[in-house]
From Swiss-Prot:
Listed SMART domains: REC (SM00448)
Sequence ranges assigned to domain Response regulatory in this UniProt record: 7-121
Primary location: cytoplasm
Keyword set includes Plastid: no
Record's GO cellular component terms: cytoplasm
Biological source species: Rhodobacter capsulatus
Keyword terms of this UniProt record: Activator, ATP-binding, Cytoplasm, DNA-binding, Nucleotide-binding, Phosphoprotein, Transcription, Transcription regulation, Two-component regulatory system
The protein's role, per its UniProt record: Probable member of the two-component regulatory system involved in the regulation of the [NiFe] hydrogenase activity. HupR1 is probably phosphorylated by the sensory component and then acts in conjunction with sigma-54 as a transcriptional activator.
Organism taxonomic ancestry: Bacteria, Pseudomonadati, Pseudomonadota, Alphaproteobacteria, Rhodobacterales
Gene from which this protein is expressed: hupR1
Residues in Sigma-54 factor interaction domain copies: 164-393
Identification of the protein by name: Hydrogenase transcriptional regulatory protein HupR1
Length: 492
């Protein structure tokens, strides 16, 4: 018996927009439509809906207002909003109030709408299965990887550029546009960017929209790998070379007819550089300890954190390999250049972490988002992910506040250029001793107040100050509550 199609609710006050969306989705979904929020609520009270796609601008109640109520009453429903407006205020409201899964901007393409709806339906099913399985795993005390976890990984790996979250005006938009151009051309591509900037995710997205998408995708990071181990991982080893006498198939052969992403290519030894060049030129590889060559037909995407062109000029990287790797070259911006994306990324990471750890969380408060957006994130996406997970672990409420943020982030006051200043930068900055001490004092005051939820009595006691003395320092440095005023709280 065939499974029933997932139910999707389309909400828009314009009949022609509803008709266009229904036409794009009706082959894959059981489509329900509503002309406005009230009609949609009535449908939700009667029907089981997995996905909602809602227009932002509607008379009466906006899409954000409607989806906020949906999150409270039907939190498992995956919510997508369509908007023609890209101002950050609207986006922040949608992220925090409605807990949306994805933005779509007008004009949307039917294939884009269908792809987003399919992904949302899969995520709905996956979340429900994961919740059920988490309960079973606790009872069984099992540490083995679950079937649902495998399916979730396959789902994420199976999606293309839609997995790369960003706002419409993101600095990431240009890199993604270039990646889309190169994806369908079977040429090597070099992704330049700092560690944690999303190079592997972009490489995976390129693979899954390429002509090789039905073939395997493998990745390896050469940074820190000894030459012999890197050679074995990439090209394999003949029987008798490794302990135990077993042969090993390298990633280059496993990725035959698929895609291989090699990060940290700047760390490749001269011998490994030569082997990579040979593989690119002739498709030939030689396993460690072997005499005969094997062949592979793969698409190579590489990632580099260093400037390979400069390394070529210094004689530390082969010029012929650099030019072979960089038929297409894409520069990825660091997270500090994507401040407008931080809230969206953090919300998505929080939702994933909440499901993974079985702990409910609805989002961040305004003060927490302000700190997260103003921090420099030298560790890029990895650091943000770890910080969000840490906040979730210590959270006592469904809405995560700024007091949960690590001290070094709370103390990192933005500089005039917008970048955060580390303690070392403050110590070596221009100015007198008094100026530098004042900078450090401002950071300590700001962090202590935030951690104590702006209770000045507790903050003053912790700092060994009177409330009058604390107030004098706040006035002197112009330190205010993130909401725009210093919040008064009664003493304990």
């Amino acid at each position: 018996m065939a499974a029933s199609a997932p139910a999707i609710l389309l909400v828009d006050d314009e009949p022609h927009s509803l008709a266009a969306m229904k036409l794009a989705l009706e082959d894959d979904f059981d489509v329900l439509t509503a002309q406005g929020a009230e009609a949609a609520i009535a449908i939700l009270e009667e029907e089981w809906v997995q996905v909602i796609i809602c227009d932002q601008r509607m008379p009466g109640r906006t899409g954000v207002d409607f989806l906020t109520e949906v999150r409270e009453r039907w939190p498992e429903t995956v919510r997508i909003i369509i908007t023609g407006y890209t101002d950050s205020a609207s986006m922040m409201a949608a992220i925090n109030d409605a807990g949306i899964h994805q933005f779509l901007t007008k004009p949307w393409h039917p294939e884009q709408l269908l792809s987003s709806a399919r992904n949302a339906a899969r995520m709905f099913t996956l979340a429900r299965e994961n919740e059920r399985l988490s309960l079973e795993m606790r009872l069984l005390n099992s540490t083995s990887e679950s079937r649902v976890e495998k399916r979730r990984r396959a789902l994420r790996e199976g999606m293309g550029f839609e997995t790369i979250l960003r706002t419409p005006n993101s600095a990431m938009t240009g890199a993604i546009a270039l990646a889309r151009q190169f994806a369908s051309f079977d040429v090597p591509v070099l992704l330049r960017g700092e560690p944690g900037s999303g190079r592997a995710q972009l490489a995976r997205a390129m693979h899954y929209v390429s002509l090789r998408s039905d073939k395997p995708f493998y990745e390896i990071n050469l940074a820190g790998l000894p030459e012999d181990l890197a050679m074995i991982e990439l090209f394999g080893a003949r029987r008798g070379v490794l302990p135990g006498g077993v042969a090993k198939i390298g990633l280059a052969q496993k990725a035959d007819r698929g895609t291989l992403f090699v990060a940290g290519v700047e760390a490749a030894s001269p011998a490994l550089q030569l082997a990579l060049l040979r593989m690119l030129a002739d498709g030939a590889i030689t396993p460690l300890g072997g005499q005969e060559t094997a062949s592979t037909n793969l698409r190579l995407i590489t990632g580099a954190a260093a400037d390979l062109r400069a390394m070529v000029a210094e004689g530390r990287f082969r010029a012929d390999l650099y030019y072979a790797l960089s038929a297409g070259e894409i520069a990825l911006p660091p997270l500090r250049a994507r401040r407008g994306d931080v809230a969206l990324l953090a919300q998505s990471m929080l939702a994933e972490a909440a499901v993974r750890h079985g702990k409910q969380a609805l989002g961040f408060d305004a003060a927490a988002l302000e700190f997260l957006e103003n921090y420099d994130w030298p560790g890029n996406l990895r650091e943000l992910h770890n910080e969000v997970t840490r906040m979730l672990i210590f959270a006592q409420d469904n809405v995560l506040g700024a007091e949960l943020i690590s001290r070094h982030i709370l103390q990192a006051a933005p500089s005039e250029s917008g970048a955060d200043r580390s303690a070392e930068e403050v110590m070596t900055a221009d100015g007198t001793l008094k100026d530098r001490i004042e900078l450090i004092e401002m950071r300590i005051l700001r962090e202590t107040l935030t951690r104590n939820r702006w209770n000045k009595s507790r903050a003053a006691a912790e700092l060994g100050l009177s409330r009058v003395g604390l107030r004098a320092k706040l006035d002197r440095y112009g330190i205010e509550h993130p909401a725009g005023r210093v919040q008064e709280e009664e003493e304990d």
